[in-house]
Regions:
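Short, well-ordered beta-strand elements
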Residues: 24-35, 57-62, 85, 136, ...
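Extracytoplasmic "Venus flytrap"
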Residues: 27-45, 64, 398-403
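Glycine-centered hinge/linker elements that transmit conformational signals in sensory
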Residues: 172-174, 214-243, 285, 289-295, ...
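Short, low-complexity disordered leader/linker segments with a strong preference
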Residues: 1-29, 52, 427, 431, ...
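Hinge/lid segment of periplasmic solute-binding proteins
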Residues: 90-144, 169, 196-199, 286-300, ...
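C-terminal lobe and pocket-closing loops
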Residues: 271-273, 279-280, 285-288, 302-410
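Extracytoplasmic/periplasmic solute-binding protein
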Residues: 132-140, 145, 169-217, 224, ...
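Extracytoplasmic "Venus flytrap"/periplasmic binding protein-like
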Residues: 45-120, 126, 152-163, 259-260, ...
Length: 445
């Protein structure tokens, strides 16, 4: 009996100890919009390594849908159960920051710990909270939009890379007929698609054309905006006919019909093996070693500025998060841990850290079809990345109106009316945009 009692006593003490251990363990809840099974597994593997090195911290990876992030955060906030970390697109940062649910001091601490100089300038500028001047979230990865162009045919025609407006116009004049090309490019002109908005926005910013000025006035009919509309729509004379969007643009370039393509870094594998067609099957690329003959021009230089367009993903540390969350975020941006996440989609997960570029270049066999210079240019594309939606001094109302501009496809409609229908000019198109955006701003105020 004594031995039995002693055994029970020992077991009881062990259980008490284990209970105390469990209570003392810090739990960090990490929501990720990388929610596919294989991606969640990669996050969990990094978290497992972290927990092995930090046994007093438990990291719970919770997959969430991108479209439902705002609603789930709202529900969690109402229940006073916000997660500690959220992986989210840059478009969420301004709203969550304005709501006061992002721990900006924690984000600043992580960025400073990693080293501010290791981050690309563009992503850092995009996460600044204009109200506080602090970084509202930690940049993580993203994709870059660029002009992909036939470098071999540019050389044959004596053209310089399509960076400046003058360079692009010169290419539009000379490329048709060069090396069997039928057109210089495919222009986004479909009024029912967002592709024209994405391409035009880079053109506009490269001429310092923005929807609002510093005082919050609508500026859709400025000389800069009119000039951007004229430059963009004039390119249609050398472009594939008819309403076009990303699919037609991609196929025309892969088939050797057009010499320039506005597209994101997601095109990289398609230029090797052909993209999927709407009716099934893949494009059969007739151009030998198309990636090796393709150049990459992410930066556009206009008369009054320069710009790169793309998307940025961030890690937000939520208000009230345990300080351990900072340690977790930094871990996910460190060494092999960061590379393992980037490897999930190397074309769409371009590193924001300069120190991670060399490792990223090794993450896909498709990268072997591109020059090291092209891969460096892709990573460098972050330096001048800007978006209308994420201009640091725009407030929540202005950003909401920009979302309305995109949602109602105002820019694609105007481009179609100017370039295809001939029912508008750049001047009348800009005037119409001014009226529409002023009305939308009034609705939001």
């Amino acid at each position: 009996m004594k031995k039995g009692l002693m055994g029970l006593l020992v077991i009881g003490l062990l259980l008490v100890g284990l209970t105390a251990y469990a209570v003392d363990k810090t739990v960090v809840e990490f929501w990720t919009t990388d929610n596919e099974t294989d991606r969640v597994a990669a996050y969990e593997a990094v978290a497992a390594r972290f927990m092995a090195e930090n046994p007093n911290i438990e990291v719970k990876i919770v997959p969430v849908d991108e479209a439902s992030v705002s609603q789930r955060i709202s529900t969690a906030r109402a229940a006073n159960k916000l997660p500690d970390i959220v992986r989210m697109g840059i478009e969420r940062v301004a709203t969550f920051s304005a709501d006061g649910i992002l721990d900006e001091d924690a984000a600043e601490a992580v960025i400073n710990s990693i080293g501010k100089s290791d981050f690309r300038a563009g992503p850092l500028n995009m996460v600044i909270d204009p109200a506080t001047g602090k970084y509202a979230a930690v940049p993580y990865d993203g994709w870059i939009q660029a002009i992909w162009y036939r470098a071999d045919l540019f050389k044959e025609a004596g053209l310089t890379p399509p960076v400046s407006w003058a360079d692009i116009n010169a290419a539009a004049d000379k490329l048709p007929g060069t090396g069997g090309l039928l057109y210089a490019l495919t222009l986004g002109t479909d009024p029912g698609q967002n592709y024209p908005q994405q391409v035009f926005e880079q053109v506009a910013i490269s001429n310092n054309a923005w929807p609002f000025d510093e005082d919050g006035n609508v500026t859709m009919n400025t000389p800069e905006m009119i000039a951007a509309l004229r430059f963009y729509t004039d390119l249609q004379s050398a472009a594939v006919p008819g309403p076009q969007y990303w699919r037609g643009a991609r196929e025309a370039y892969e088939l050797g019909q057009a010499g320039m393509l506005f597209y994101s870094t997601y095109i990289m594998d398609d230029l090797v093996e052909g993209s999927g067609m709407e009716g099934g099957g893949k494009v059969q690329i007739p151009v030998k070693d198309l990636p090796g003959k393709t150049g990459f021009a992410p930066k556009m230089v206009g008369p009054n500025g320069s710009a790169t367009y793309g998307q940025l993903v961030t890690l937000g540390i939520m208000e009230g998060a345990d300080p351990a969350a900072q340690k977790v975020v930094e871990y996910f941006l460190t060494g092999q841990n960061y590379q393992d996440i980037l490897a999930l989609a190397p074309f769409g997960k371009v590193p924001v850290l300069k120190s991670a570029v060399d490792g990223w270049k090794q993450l896909s066999p498709y990268f072997g079809h591109y020059s090291s210079e092209t891969l460096d240019q892709i990573a460098n594309g972050y330096e001048t990345m800007q978006r209308w939606l994420f201009r640091p001094d725009y407030d929540a109302t202005e950003r909401a109106v920009i979302g309305d501009i995109e949602g109602r496809k105002l820019i694609p409609q105007v481009i179609s009316n100017i370039a295809l229908e001939g029912t508008m000019t750049p001047e009348t198109g800009a005037a119409w945009l001014q009226e529409q955006v002023e009305a939308m701003l009034a609705e939001r105020q």
